[in-house]
């Protein structure tokens, strides 16, 4: 067996040598490489250097990647911690929490909290103790029965929460009070402005209504005037056409001798209708009697010229058709009279709202105690707003005296006292700031005017 192994090893060495020789034949470069060992060493050294540089680059890249991974881990940890912190805390408005931490007895923030064990409602210690001492053995919020003050328990956790939310309770309550007062003042101002606007609107509406009534009256008067003119013109035209038709009919009837009897009958009928229309017009006292008579005489004859007038042809309005159909010749005059009365009533009603100031008539009489002459024009007419001072100046100017030297008197008994010029006991002196309207009712005489007496003022 060992001899076989050695033989196989020798054969393998020969095979390798043969292969190397064949490779040298077909690869002359390899032979040259083997022949230059210095070059081979230089190449090996340069390759080692390149490998070292590559290794350094790979290590640097690995270190950078590790650093980035660590940074990302730190960032993720910090972000997760921030999210946890944000989830733990939330922003709260104190105005929204006030209702939850408010005592229902004093309506302020709870101080030294005490909780009712039966219903878990919280109150201030002083408030609930005082309520219990007064005999209210029940919860002030839900009215649940409480046996005694033993059912009350302190709540330090709630006190700690209030202390964390409201660091200065007194200051917070003061700010809330000021805010409420400002809000109330603002609401009052808004209400006052709304009231002023409503008053202005109501005044504007009243003015519009008054102006509208005045314009309506003017427009009605103009329309009525225009309508009356149109009616007169139409009646004149109709009268002319009816007279022409009558002349033609008479000529035709004169030619036909056989139709004498019906003509006489028609004339009798027309003459019979004339006095009734004239009597009705006289009773109504209308201005256009002549034109209405002619219109009622020939009401049976309708000319084609009047077709455009809607007032004469309208049914039931006192026009020609209604007169001919119903046989009532006075209906047009009655409707006109009613229209005039209606306009007069509307005009008088519109005058009721206007404050019309009427003039006051007075007579100036002199007592002639010191030889003062009477005025040339003693009867005067003044407005009610005239002052006594102005009247005194008027008298003094005509008497050529100063206004301070003239004294005006008035008597409430009328002409009886003034007849005795020397007696001034029942007369009353007038002040400068008085108006004539104040003296109108008390001092009117039987003649319908006011009597004022003047004299020279007696200076002590």
UniProtKB/Swiss-Prot annotation:
Localization: Nucleus
EC top class, as a word: transferase
GO cellular component, one term: PRC1 complex
Bias (Acidic residues): 32-51, 59-71, 240-249
Domain of life: Eukaryota
Matches recorded under PROSITE patterns: ZF_RING_1, ZF_RING_2
Record field: compositional bias (Low complexity): 276-290
EC number: 2.3.2.27
UniProt xrefs under Pfam families: zf-C3HC4_2 (PF13923)
GO biological-process terms attached to the record: cell fate determination; chromatin organization; maintenance of floral meristem identity; maintenance of inflorescence meristem identity; maintenance of shoot apical meristem identity; negative regulation of DNA-templated transcription; protein ubiquitination
Consequence of gene disruption: Normal phenotype. Drastic growth defects like ectopic meristem formation and sterility when associated with the disruption of RING1A.
Predominant cellular place of this UniProt entry's protein: nucleus
Domain note: The RING-type zinc finger domain mediates binding to an E2 ubiquitin-conjugating enzyme.
Function per UniProt: Putative E3 ubiquitin-protein ligase that mediates monoubiquitination of 'Lys-119' of histone H2A (H2AK119ub), thereby playing a central role in histone code and gene regulation.
Protein name (Swiss-Prot/TrEMBL): Putative E3 ubiquitin-protein ligase RING1b
